[in-house]
């Protein structure tokens, strides 16, 4: 049985394409059942996020299974296959396993190390389990992916460094103030950077967030999203004394906060420190503000330096994570191979043993005056011969480094000797520890 992956991501398709094939999380039953109803597809999990849509499936027919899933994606979403296909990737065997382990470990994410993707895959697996589209192989496969992701998080520092300007700003604020839960943040601007910063500040425990923007409606919208307080831009100078941390990212062509403003602001704050983060280009805050006592100003260049350093560190940690993924691939394939190899070996030995015993019985029954103990010796002899004959094929089957050749060997033996192989059981899953 083969694991296959068919999908697209931010690396292969623009958002205009990704949104065409996205699956609604609350409506997963229908597409999951449709995939497992495809010929030769036995199990399926659908992962659909803002950055990727992927289908994980099991099949004996790799090429056919991939083609059917591609056609399903096109037909289900009413998108021409010729348009979709140039954005799709497909993997099977070890490549499929490596891909999913890397995705779960956030090695394939837009921001390497981000934690959201693991939770999204767990949610997707939950739907597959609920609607019974996953079975023994994908159940084990996804649990192994979760285990790999946990190892990566535990054994590397891949998620510990800021790799976006907005996140770097929050990390810098933490270094300056320590605990941020009792601090008030003022966001000047309502664009993507301010939105990201709002998310990060709230994630680290900030409860007081204010938002101002030249267009008040945009400030209101962002404030509503994060349970913050919208402020009219005209009230900026009256609002500044209430803020401990000010992050500014507007499109203004000139400074909106000047050195001369700070004397009155600090007096009203009783000279408590203020932390300014100016990530606008051109800059929003007069650089001379940094010369004012108790005012600390950082620009986008300061933060980019932090990000660049952390990106280099994250590359080192990513290499460690890739090594963990490679280790775990071997363990998973050892278990996967055993699902079909072990029953086949048992069936092969049973088949040969039945022939041996039948021929031994015929020989013994027609042998008059058989010496005492001879039957026992003949039984041992024929059993030894059988073991010698089966040793080499059994050893080859038990090897775990053969990739898809094991499937060929298993199918060949089953067909050549007309073997009756028992079904795969849940007990096999216990052969591989987390």
Swiss-Prot record:
Substrate binds at residues 49-52, 109, 114-116, 120. Pathway: Porphyrin-containing compound metabolism; protoporphyrin-IX biosynthesis; 5-aminolevulinate from L-glutamyl-tRNA(Glu): step 1/2. Its EC number is 1.2.1.70. Keywords: NADP, Oxidoreductase, Porphyrin biosynthesis. Pfam families: GlutR_dimer, GlutR_N, Shikimate_DH. The record marks 99 as: Important for activity. The keyword Transport does not apply. The keyword Cell membrane does not apply. The active site is at residue 50. PANTHER family: GLUTAMYL-TRNA REDUCTASE (PTHR43013:SF1). This is Glutamyl-tRNA reductase. It comes from Geobacter sp. (strain M21). The gene is hemA.
């Amino acid at each position: 049985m083969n694991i296959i992956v068919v999908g697209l991501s931010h690396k292969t398709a623009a958002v205009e394409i990704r949104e065409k094939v996205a699956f609604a999380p609350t409506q997963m039953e229908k597409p999951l059942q449709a995939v497992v109803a495809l010929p030769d597809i036995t199990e399926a999990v659908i992962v659909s996020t803002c950055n990727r849509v992927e289908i994980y499936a099991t099949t004996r027919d790799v090429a056919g299974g991939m083609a059917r899933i591609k056609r399903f994606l096109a037909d289900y979403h009413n998108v021409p296959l010729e348009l979709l296909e140039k954005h799709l990737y497909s993997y099977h065997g070890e490549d499929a396993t490596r891909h999913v382990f890397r995705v779960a470990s956030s090695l394939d994410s837009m921001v390497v190390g981000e934690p959201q993707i693991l939770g999204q895959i767990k949610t997707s697996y939950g739907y597959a389990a609920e609607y019974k589209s996953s079975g023994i192989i994908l159940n084990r496969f996804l649990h192994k992916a979760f285990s790999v992701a946990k190892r990566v998080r535990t054994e590397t520092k891949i998620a510990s460094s800021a790799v976006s300007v907005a996140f770097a700003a929050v990390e810098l604020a933490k270094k300056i103030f320590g605990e941020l839960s009792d601090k008030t943040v003022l966001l000047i601007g309502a664009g993507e950077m301010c939105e990201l910063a709002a998310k990060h500040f709230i994630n680290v425990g900030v409860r007081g967030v204010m938002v101002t923007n030249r267009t008040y409606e945009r400030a209101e919208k962002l404030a509503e999203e994060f349970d913050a307080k919208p402020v009219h831009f005209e009230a900026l100078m009256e609002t500044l004394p209430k803020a401990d941390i000010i992050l500014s990212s507007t499109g203004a062509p000139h400074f909106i906060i000047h050195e001369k403003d700070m004397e009155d602001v600090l007096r009203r704050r009783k000279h408590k420190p203020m932390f300014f983060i100016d990530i606008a280009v051109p800059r929003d805050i007069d650089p001379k503000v940094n010369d004012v006592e108790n005012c600390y100003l950082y620009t986008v260049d300061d933060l980019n330096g932090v990000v660049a350093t952390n990106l280099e560190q994250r590359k080192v940690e990513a290499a460690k994570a890739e090594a963990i993924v490679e280790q775990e691939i071997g363990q998973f394939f050892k278990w996967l191979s055993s699902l079909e190899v072990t029953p086949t070996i048992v069936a092969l030995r049973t088949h040969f043993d039945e022939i041996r015993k039948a021929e031994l019985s015929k020989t013994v029954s027609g042998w008059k005056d058989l010496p005492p103990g001879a039957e026992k010796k003949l039984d041992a002899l024929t059993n030894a011969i059988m073991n010698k004959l089966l040793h080499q094929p059994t050893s080859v089957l038990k090897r775990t480094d053969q990739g898809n050749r094991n499937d060929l060997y298993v199918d060949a033996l089953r067909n050549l000797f007309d073997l009756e192989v028992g079904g795969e059981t849940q007990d096999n899953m216990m052969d591989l520890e987390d």
